[in-house]
From Swiss-Prot:
Chief localisation class: membrane
Protein name per the record: Solute carrier family 38 member 10
Family as reported in the entry's similarity comment: Belongs to the amino acid/polyamine transporter 2 family.
Species this chain originates from: Pongo abelii (Sumatran orangutan)
Lineage summary: Eukaryota, Metazoa, Chordata, Craniata, Vertebrata
InterPro entries: AA_transpt_TM (IPR013057)
Chain spans, region Disordered: 434-691, 731-904, 965-1068
Function: Facilitates bidirectional transport of amino acids. May act as a glutamate sensor that regulates glutamate-glutamine cycle and mTOR signaling in the brain. The transport mechanism remains to be elucidated.
Membrane topology field: Multi-pass membrane protein
Keyword Transmembrane: yes
Pfam families (alphabetical): Aa_trans (PF01490)
Phosphoserine found at: 612, 802, 890, 966, 999
Amino acid sequence: MTAAAASNWGLITNIVNSIVGVSVLTMPFCFKQCGIVLGALLLVFCSWMTHQSCMFLVKSASLSKRRTYAGLAFHAYGKAGKMLVETSMIGLMLGTCIAFYVVIGDLGSNFFARLFGFQVGGTFRMFLLFAVSLCIVLPLSLQRNMMASIQSFSAMALLFYTVFMFVIVLSSLKHGLFSGQWLRRVSYVRWEGVFRCIPIFGMSFACQSQVLPTYDSLDEPSVKTMSSIFASSLNVVTTFYVMVGFFGYVSFTEATAGNVLMHFPSNLVTEMLRVGFMMSVAVGFPMMILPCRQALSTLLCEQQQKDGTFAAGGYMPPLRFKALTLSVVFGTMVGGILIPNVETILGLTGATMGSLICFICPALIYKKIHKNALSSQVVLWVGLGILVVSTVTTLSVSEDVPEDLAEEAPGGRLGEAEGLMKVEAARLSAQDPVVAVAEDGREKPKLPKEREELEQAQIKGPVDVPGREDGKEAQEEAQLDRPGQGIAVPVGEAHRHEPPVPHDKVVVDEGQDQEVPEENKPPSRHAGRKAPGVQGQMAPPLPDSEREKREPEQGEVGKRPGQAQALEEAGDLPEDPQKVPEADGQPAVQPAKEDLEPGDGGLHPRPQAVLSEQQNGLAVDEGEKAEGVPPPGNAAGDTGQPAEDSDHGGKPPLPEEKPAPGAGLPPEPREQRDVERAGGDQAASQLEEAGRAEMLDHAVLLQVIKEQQVQQKRLLDQQEKLLAVIEEQHKEIHQQRQEDEEDKPRQVEVHPEPGAAVPRGQEAPEGKARETMENLPPLPLDPVLRAPGGRPAPSQDLNQRSLEHPERPVGRDPAGPPDGGPDTEPRAAQAKPRDGQKDAAPGAAGTVKELLKGLEQVPVPDPAREAGGPEERLAEEFPGQSQDVTGGGSQDRKKPGKEVAATGTGILKEANWLVAGPGAEMGDPHMKPKQMSRDLGLAVDLPGGAEGAAAQPQAVLRQPELRVISDGEQGGQQGHRLDHGGYLEMRKEARGGDHMPVSHEQLGGEEDAAVPEPRQRPEPELGLKQAVPGGQRPDNAKPNRDLKLQAGSDLRRRRRDLGPHAEGELAPRDRVIIGLNPLPDVQVNDLRGALDAQLRQAAGGALQVVHSRQLRQAPGAPEES
């Protein structure tokens, strides 16, 4: 399994990407419903069932040889099974899309409403969903080929999920993961939530649609490999889900809502997480819509074929494509607007379509194909149970939503912004109430400490209480928890209303004024509901420590003061707390008790009745919750009423408190208030300091995080720039190497295009290769030349020419055709890049035509014959090019090719002097202008095309030319520059008469133009030499490299022999051919001289090479023919 995981990690990552989705947001909610232990066990069980169902599909596919889910169903149960699978798949993906919309509405509406200053509500949520679907989802979904980008987006979504998990873990640490407070607040096993959570768990692992595509993508498909891949993937996902569920539940306990992200306090990190998560979900829509659309198309429009199978879903008509996309996008959008919470849609979808696709269908298919399978029976019955019971349970719970989840949905989701603002208000109120208390204390006389004890819980500032230290600790803990406290508040506690933002101070002041008459004051039902934590247990006066805790907590949560009073006064009111509605079937009070109990030990230095202790614990916990709950718990998302209560900010309780204490403010209460406020001022100052410290710490952390992010971003930018530079350098180096390598292999091994221009990089290697080739017999060259197309491969010089032709789009078009005579098609491809050449070619065409006339008169050696046919083809295809550069040369080559075939060596010699004499003379005047133009823009291959046309046409015309041309164009462009300098040198050297050395050196830069031309010039001699070895070399041609090496040596020798002839005879043509490249640097007269010298040099090196190549080409010509 490990080996498979290591070798198939890419597949595992893709599967994890496809499994993990929005359902991860509901994991803490499911853990709250089932308890930590039972939730984890159910996750493991669902993971095992998913693995079994995937293996059912793989085994069935291996036996039936089917490779699609629907195909397996059709194989097992016919059209009915196929229809069931397709319908279930469509429903599953539609449900997932609706869940996506719900999450976007939850996360986006609050953020954007706060950003633009709108009121969060149903209207804004609808507008947001419509805008997202119209601007993001629809454009992406209308793309036919988005899978590559979609996969990158899905990877981005996975990144957000990972960040989300770490945020959850940090949140749990902040909420006292190691303090142990959560131990009594959480539940471990709750059987009543099993059937509501199993469908969500089952759907959260849904990956059956990815099984068969993954199976097909394996190099060696096997059941064992698939088992290991999916086992690894499911293990990763299970671990991820358990961590998110556990830490999320510990962080928010009973306040946990369906979408955990709703609980986090508003800060830069959490807002970025929300927005990023929302955008990743929006961009992930096409992942669901693409397969859904395809399934709909096949279900509605697919026709059964004669053989009983169905055509694989292929191209979809545009109209149907758009219609299905629009219907899916906007249909699911309406569903997202109508369904308020994500756990409901995920539960319904998972219970129906999810159970069918994930468990029932795979088990049925496997059971039909494998007669006896116990595991399939288990999975089948569990799936059926989920389908029936979970559907009923989910629907029944959704009916109760008005009391419970309904409040969470509208209050926690639609009114999340308000809830968050209330949370912030609660935090501020914790400080503001303290200030208010201080003000009230100023106006009122201090009361005895007895009153303080009773009222301290309300006042938030315990004064002179022996338990103060404990209270301080509790306050500090509460404050620490405050930012994201989210301590689970039982549904009953939802009735605890945090003070309304605007009324925080006023409420607190009035409450304090009215606090004194707590005895006279009737316990508010809200207070009782808060007391629910006590569960109807009467709360005797809380110990000072508890009161201190309550006071700071109440001070922080403006609501707490009145509530604490209500609790103290309602210590006799166990009924109200009991009355508190239970959240998700759990009595709100119990969690409160559990939460309070852990803290009670520390808070109650004095032993008290169990009820009093529980009440104290509840009060403390509530205080802590108030501190921490303000953001999440009181956000109204935590409890059924929180939305409304939080909306009022605890106004309902406050009014009750106000009237009760308002009944009459005895002087004692005022004095007590003064005393309490004195202590309250201290407590308030302490709370404020603690709060400020927390805020400062938080601000510092945020600042540090921002700075780190900025630094990281800068580093990343720098790295990206460096990478870009490095990539560019690598590309340049790689291109150069490729050019060099391509030149080498093409010149040595393929020599495909004798007339094709060779890139500089290639020319240089060709020069070396030629040297080596000169050392070796030329025979291997023929095989090489033939290697590319089976035809005699063009010589390196020819290749260079062809390469140069692309380089000199203008002047080398003509050269290209002669070289590409046989490779007419390649030339066609080359013709496009040479369009520029064609433009410039017309001028050269005239000169070339003249040269052609001379060349026509000149017989060309046998290689010309071979090349002649292809040249003719090229001339026909590229009349302008062939005529311009090699028009004459190619024609001459064709003629000499024929003549050489007839006359042999004699024709080659005649061709040589004809080419050198008339061809050169004809070419010189015309070639000079051509050379000027070509040298200015490109390396000149015109003469090379004309003279070397005979030998080169064959190789050039052959397929190798294509390669050479492509390379030649790249290398030719570089070669042109080199050619200019090289040609100047060559001209000088040519003038000096050093054709051989110059040709070799210039082969790097001039070989493109110069070498091919010399080939033509020595063609007579080469033709003779090649005529004899040409026939033999073709036989030996296939030991290309060895023969090439030998040929290289022979070529050098031949070049030396031919050098003078080439110089004398080919001088004019050399001028024409080589002059093209050097023309820019040389004047017309100088150009001729330089061209002559260059041609001679090129002839010296190229002609020798051409001999071997021509000889090889000669045998290749018959092959071509």
